[in-house]
């Protein structure tokens, strides 16, 4: 039988007749579910089979939250320098250049102002794909300036966190951003301007220790990893087994660290419902 044997050897297909399968047609979730890429995008990058929320960046969040994907980006051209002349396995300047070329981003956060369900909203959204979403001087400065913009124009402010923490290549300059951003958020609170913190997967390190937990409401998406040190580090340090679902958004909500968890498809409606209520406005459908 020739079912599993080629009867004629040396058969070759001309290159022009080969059909290439485009990349990105399918997505496989951690549970093994296969999803069509177009279906995934139309479902807010959530796997319809198991509800898994795929990691997305500022482009996708702006598209979800701003009406008709229209917004004005703030401080668009700001980039990091290398004040410490830092070098580990490669020079910091080379690492930044490689990240910029790979992602098309200037740094790990983008800030913008636009309409969300008809009302103005300022959003600072982190991008994990840029050096792990690490917080350096530019990230802190852009968030601080976005908060200043919200304060000056009396607009609600929202930060979408997705970060591995402080950027080690900037050392103490990076750690200073925790204090800088916290002070700006305190100014918003004094002016009674709403601040919403959305912690997404993953939100860790100095980000968690600063602006990610300082919202008037702190919210998250299902299954997000949120903590200071990662679960492996905590377990290795304490030598103890960790509770079930430790450092997940569900665990933190149960312990009172989060106000609520929302599916991405409901995010825009829920944050605007909150803004309507806290600003004593008619609730929009």
From Swiss-Prot:
Leader peptide range in chain numbering: none
Keyword Lyase: no
Localization per Swiss-Prot or TrEMBL: Cytoplasm
Catalytically driven reaction(s): N(6)-carboxybiotinyl-L-lysyl-[protein] + acetyl-CoA = N(6)-biotinyl-L-lysyl-[protein] + malonyl-CoA
InterPro entries per record: AcCoA_carboxyl_beta, Acetyl_CoA_COase_Trfase_b_su, ClpP/crotonase-like_dom_sf, COA_CT_N
Enzyme Commission numbers on file: 2.1.3.15
Major subcellular site: cytoplasm
Domain CoA carboxyltransferase N-terminal: 24-285
Top-level taxonomic group: Bacteria
GO biological process, one term: fatty acid biosynthetic process
GO annotation, cellular component aspect: acetyl-CoA carboxylase complex
Swiss-Prot/TrEMBL keywords: ATP-binding, Cytoplasm, Fatty acid biosynthesis, Fatty acid metabolism, Lipid biosynthesis, Lipid metabolism, Nucleotide-binding, Transferase
Molecular function via GO: acetyl-CoA carboxylase activity; ATP binding; carboxyl- or carbamoyltransferase activity
Record's subunit section: Acetyl-CoA carboxylase is a heterohexamer composed of biotin carboxyl carrier protein (AccB), biotin carboxylase (AccC) and two subunits each of ACCase subunit alpha (AccA) and ACCase subunit beta (AccD).
HAMAP family according to UniProt: AcetylCoA_CT_beta (MF_01395)
Protein's job: Component of the acetyl coenzyme A carboxylase (ACC) complex. Biotin carboxylase (BC) catalyzes the carboxylation of biotin on its carrier protein (BCCP) and then the CO(2) group is transferred by the transcarboxylase to acetyl-CoA to form malonyl-CoA.
Protein name: Acetyl-coenzyme A carboxylase carboxyl transferase subunit beta
Species lineage: Bacteria, Pseudomonadati, Bacteroidota, Flavobacteriia, Flavobacteriales
Gene expressing this chain: accD
């Amino acid at each position: 039988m020739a079912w599993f044997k080629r009867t004629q050897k040396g058969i070759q297909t001309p290159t022009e007749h080969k059909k290439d399968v485009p990349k990105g047609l399918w997505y496989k979730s951690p549970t093994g579910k296969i999803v069509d890429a177009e279906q995934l995008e139309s479902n807010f990058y959530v796997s319809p089979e198991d509800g898994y929320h795929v990691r997305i960046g500022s482009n996708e969040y702006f598209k979800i939250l701003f009406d008709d994907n229209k917004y004005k980006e703030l401080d668009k051209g700001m980039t990091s320098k290398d004040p410490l002349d830092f070098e580990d396995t490669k020079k910091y300047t080379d690492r930044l250049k490689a990240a910029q070329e790979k992602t098309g981003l200037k740094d790990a956060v983008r800030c913008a102002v636009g309409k969300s369900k008809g009302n103005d909203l300022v959003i600072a959204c982190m991008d994990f794909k840029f050096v792990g979403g690490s917080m350096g001087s530019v990230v802190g400065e852009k968030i601080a300036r976005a908060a200043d913009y919200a304060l000056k124009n009396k607009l609600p402010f929202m930060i979408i966190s997705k970060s591995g923490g402080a950027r080690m290549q900037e050392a103490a300059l990076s750690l200073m951003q925790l204090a800088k951003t916290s002070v700006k958020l305190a100014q918003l609170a004094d002016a009674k301007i709403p601040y919403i913190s959305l912690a997404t997967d993953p939100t860790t390190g100095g980000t968690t220790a600063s602006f990610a937990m300082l919202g008037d409401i702190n919210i998250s998406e299902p299954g997000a990893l949120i903590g200071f040190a990662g679960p492996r580090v905590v377990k290795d340090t304490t030598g103890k087994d960790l509770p079930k679902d430790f450092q997940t958004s569900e665990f933190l909500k149960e312990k009172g660290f989060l106000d609520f968890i929302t599916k991405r498809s409901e995010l825009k409606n829920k944050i605007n419902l909150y803004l309507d209520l806290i600003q004593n406005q008619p609730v929009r459908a």
